[in-house]
């Protein structure tokens, strides 16, 4: 079978949104070429544990590659992807050039091409993200491994917003905590919470493909006794109280449910949010405070922030 490699040149801010659009369009694999990966802060903090080839990354911006089987409807699929990306600026998401190119690849090439972008990455004092096909031995008994198959995943666990959420969970999760993960994507935050000692994690996503991906990764990490995955829109119809809510979503989406979060999280409980570019920190903080939360800590990495807020 012949496959088409769709390459989109965009910004780091738009990576999650564009990746989601591509998965929604039926992509069978997505690879992200972000030159920031070459100089990640974690390399100074934890030591470089893999080598990347700078020649494979764009000089500026981010290149997202997605793989689609060649069909009679491919042209319409690409047009739909472009239309969806063109709408993102109306949500204050900078898309950069948004240029789209198409190349033909053989099945044997695409099946392994995107895997070269995923390697074991230690993202915190506790966790290392490991692709399922990689051999990796923990460096200490305390190191926790999260295995991910990013073939369908919405994020690989190494984006700054996901990294900060995991570090925030490390700071806050107590044994026996009950947790809700809103917009779970690959399930990585739910898996981390389970491995940190949570007794119950409810993971929700509106996208059925994300739900399938999260379920697979939860089983892969043997955390399905703690984590339940379901399809749901944000916190609609969800009852509390729970000890903690975590949501790694675009700022525009977070603004839709601070009041629901305050309703579901117990008094004194926590709401961890990320997916927030630095320029939108103030508007998110104000919305959380208006809903009754107190900002306890703000984590920063590159141009992104994560907020830890406590309910009244």
UniProtKB/Swiss-Prot annotation:
UniProt xrefs under SUPFAM superfamilies: S-adenosyl-L-methionine-dependent methyltransferases
Recorded catalytic activity of this chain's protein: L-lysyl-[protein] + 3 S-adenosyl-L-methionine = N(6),N(6),N(6)-trimethyl-L-lysyl-[protein] + 3 S-adenosyl-L-homocysteine + 3 H(+)
GO cellular component, one term: cytoplasm
Residues that bind S-adenosyl-L-methionine: 162, 183, 205, 248
Subcellular location per the Swiss-Prot or TrEMBL entry: Cytoplasm
Protein EC: 2.1.1.-
Any single biological process term in GO: methylation
Keyword list, A-Z: Cytoplasm, Methyltransferase, S-adenosyl-L-methionine, Transferase
N-terminal signal peptide: none
Molecular function as annotated in GO: protein-lysine N-methyltransferase activity
S-S bridge residues: none
Main location as per UniProt: cytoplasm
EC category: transferase
Physiological role: Methylates ribosomal protein L11.
HAMAP family found in the cross-reference section: Methyltr_PrmA
PANTHER family per the UniProt record, alphabetical: ELECTRON TRANSFER FLAVOPROTEIN BETA SUBUNIT LYSINE METHYLTRANSFERASE
Name the record gives this protein: Ribosomal protein L11 methyltransferase
Name of the gene this protein is made from: prmA
């Amino acid at each position: 079978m012949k496959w088409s490699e769709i390459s989109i040149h965009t910004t780091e801010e738009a990576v999650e949104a564009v990746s989601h659009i591509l998965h929604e369009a039926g992509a069978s694999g997505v690879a992200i070429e972000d030159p920031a990966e070459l100089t990640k802060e974690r390399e100074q903090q934890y030591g470089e544990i893999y080598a990347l080839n700078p020649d494979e990354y764009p000089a500026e911006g981010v290149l997202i590659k997605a793989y689609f089987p060649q069909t009679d409807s491919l042209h319409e699929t690409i047009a739909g992807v472009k239309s969806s990306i063109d709408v993102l600026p109306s949500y204050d998401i900078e898309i950069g050039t948004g240029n789209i190119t198409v190349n033909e690849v053989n099945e044997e090439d695409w099946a392994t091409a995107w895997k070269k972008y995923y390697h074991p990455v230690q993202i915190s004092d506790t966790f290392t993200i490991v692709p399922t096909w990689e051999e990796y031995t923990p460096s200490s008994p305390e190191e926790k491994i999260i295995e991910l198959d990013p073939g369908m995943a919405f994020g690989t666990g190494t984006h700054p917003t996901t990294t900060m959420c995991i570090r925030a969970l490390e700071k806050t999760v107590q044994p026996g905590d009950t947790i809700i993960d809103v917009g779970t994507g690959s399930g990585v935050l739910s898996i981390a919470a389970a491995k940190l000692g949570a007794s119950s994690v409810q993971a929700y996503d509106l996208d059925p493909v994300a739900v399938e991906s999260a379920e697979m990764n939860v089983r892969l990490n043997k955390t399905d006794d703690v984590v339940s995955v379901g399809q749901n829109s944000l916190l609609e119809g969800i009852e509390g109280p729970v000890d903690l809510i975590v949501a790694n979503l675009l700022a525009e989406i977070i603004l839709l449910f601070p009041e629901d979060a305050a309703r579901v999280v117990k008094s004194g409980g926590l709401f961890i949010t990320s997916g927030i570019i630095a320029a939108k920190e103030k508007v998110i903080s104000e919305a959380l405070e208006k809903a009754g939360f107190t900002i306890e800590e703000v984590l920063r990495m590159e141009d992104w922030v994560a907020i830890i807020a406590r309910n009244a």
